[in-house]
């Protein structure tokens, strides 16, 4: 039986972008329906992405720190890795958050329908699951269906030892020899996790750099610190993956030199993600897709059909949960009649590796490309009392200032908890702060966050925690 549902707003997808949009719509008094293909809210991020990866990265960090404590006089035995318990702990964390979302949905009186959605017209869509079929008529729709991993056509993905990020986070096993293809954020984070859990990890990338948006002085610090964790090979691509009963046999080309018959127990393909829009029936309603495969939207997240919105990964890069959350808020507010726009000055990015890498605004090389008259101010963490005391002095805080007005235009941090520090830099850029604003803001001592204030002091020529090279200028 085809049931008919009527609503003011239908949101397709319950990841961070989708549930944020639905919750905001409900808070603004709009009758809201949420459609989710799976049995739990939260999308990739909460269920098989951001949250489980951070749970495992925390475990990896503790393992590494415990190992390094021997130099202080505290030694531990080799850790006993119980994969079943780790998986249960990871799922406990996921369940706690998804259950919280479910509770908030109920309290907001948002109706939810599980199943696959496809547009029938620009005012209706069909939702089907194994038991039911619904037709939902709406005034406004928000598409928030997220993204999926990109596959390499020449690799036999039907073999259970060829993984994507979801497989890697399910902890199927801890492979003795593990190959990761792709040195983006996902690849580097998975390398961090599995090397800590005992795998011998090779990570390869066909390009001559990893995380290409960051500056070389930031990436070089990271590269030096991972030498004992895993093997990073750039300028390397896969030639062939042969499936055998006991192993995956890989041939690769490293810096134009063939490397043949390398045995791996598992291979993770982490070369990026693509918008999850193929099965929505967008062609039926004439929804425009841009040249990069994303749904085309304006700064109010409207598509070319004004009452249909797109947010999150389907609406363009950067494909980050926090960007999608803010887009969800804007879309809901526009639907409710508010004249709001999605126009952030900057969006932060973080690689939750060990050490972490975080950046926001312009990098130095981007400032060069834009012909900006800029100046770099760096505070090295080997001059930070807190970093030295915490055994994390490998790192630096780097700020970029426009020399014409001394305003901050970008920042990068590599080091422990860099992701927790970068927010101050983002706020400073959004607020239009200049170096003096940051330098005269009293930061607590000893903290890692004071490295931001001290970097501004380097620019100002007032720093006393390192040599002041501006004294005679």
From Swiss-Prot:
* Named cofactor requirement(s): FAD
Record-level GO BP terms: 2-oxoglutarate metabolic process
Q: Name one GO molecular function term.
A: dihydrolipoyl dehydrogenase (NADH) activity
Entry keyword Cytoplasm: yes
Residues the record marks as active site: 445 (proton acceptor)
Q: Which Pfam families match?
A: Pyr_redox_2 (PF07992), Pyr_redox_dim (PF02852)
| Subcellular location, record wording | Cytoplasm
Q: Where does NAD(+) bind?
A: 182-186, 205, 270-273
According to its record, what are the GO cellular component terms? Answer: cytoplasm
Q: Which residues bind FAD?
A: 36-45, 54, 117, 313, 321
Superkingdom, taxonomy of origin: Bacteria
Quaternary data: Homodimer.
Name of this chain's protein? Dihydrolipoyl dehydrogenase
What organism does the record attribute this protein to?
Buchnera aphidicola subsp. Acyrthosiphon pisum (strain APS)
């Amino acid at each position: 039986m085809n049931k008919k549902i009527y609503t003011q707003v239908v949101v397709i997808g319950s990841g961070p972008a989708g549930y944020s949009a639905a919750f905001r719509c409900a808070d603004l008094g709009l009758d809201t329906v949420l459609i989710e293909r799976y049995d739990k809210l939260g999308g990739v991020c909460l269920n098989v992405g951001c949250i489980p990866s951070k749970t495992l990265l925390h475990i990896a960090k503790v393992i590494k720190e415990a190992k390094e404590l021997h130099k202080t006089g505290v030694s531990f035995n080799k850790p006993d890795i119980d994969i079943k318990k780790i998986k249960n702990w990871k799922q406990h964390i996921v369940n706690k958050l998804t259950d919280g979302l479910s509770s908030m949905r109920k309290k907001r009186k948002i109706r939810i329908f599980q199943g696959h959605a496809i547009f029938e017209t620009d005012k209706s869509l069909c939702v089907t699951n194994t038991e039911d079929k619904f037709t939902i008529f709406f005034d406004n729709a928000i598409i928030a269906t997220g993204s999926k991993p990109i596959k390499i056509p020449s690799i036999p993905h039907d073999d259970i030892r060829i993984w994507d990020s979801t497989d890697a986070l399910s902890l199927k096993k801890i492979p003795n020899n593990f190959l990761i293809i792709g040195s983006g954020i996902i690849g580097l984070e998975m390398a961090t996790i599995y090397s800590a859990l005992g795998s011998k990890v090779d990570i390869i990338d066909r390009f001559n750099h990893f995380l290409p948006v960051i500056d070389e002085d930031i990436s070089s610090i990271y590269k030096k610190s991972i030498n004992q964790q895993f093997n990073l090979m750039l300028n390397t691509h896969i030639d062939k993956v042969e499936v055998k009963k006991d192993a995956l046999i890989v041939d690769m080309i490293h810096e134009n030199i063939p490397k043949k018959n390398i045995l791996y127990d598992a291979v993770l393909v982490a070369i990026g993600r693509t918008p999850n829009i193929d099965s929505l029936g967008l062609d039926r309603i004439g929804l425009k897709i841009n040249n990069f495969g994303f749904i085309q939207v304006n700064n109010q997240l409207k598509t070319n059909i004004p009452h249909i919105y797109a947010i999150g990964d389907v609406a363009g890069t950067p494909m980050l949960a926090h960007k999608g959350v803010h887009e969800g808020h804007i879309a809901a507010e526009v639907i409710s009649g508010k004249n709001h726009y999605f126009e952030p000055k900057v969006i932060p990015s973080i690689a939750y590796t060990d050490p972490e890498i975080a950046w926001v605004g312009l990098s130095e090389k981007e400032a060069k490309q834009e012909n900006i008259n800029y100046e770099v101010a760096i505070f090295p963490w080997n001059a930070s009392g807190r970093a030295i005391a915490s055994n994390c002095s490998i790192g630096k805080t780097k700020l970029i200032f426009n020399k014409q007005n001394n305003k901050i235009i970008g920042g990068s941090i590599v080091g422990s908890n860099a992701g927790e520090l970068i927010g101050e830099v983002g706020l400073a850029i959004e607020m239009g702060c200049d170096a003096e604003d940051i330098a005269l803001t009293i930061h607590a001592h000893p903290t890692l966050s004071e490295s931001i204030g001290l970097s501004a002091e380097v620019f100002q020529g007032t720093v006393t925690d390192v040599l002041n090279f501006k004294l005679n200028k």
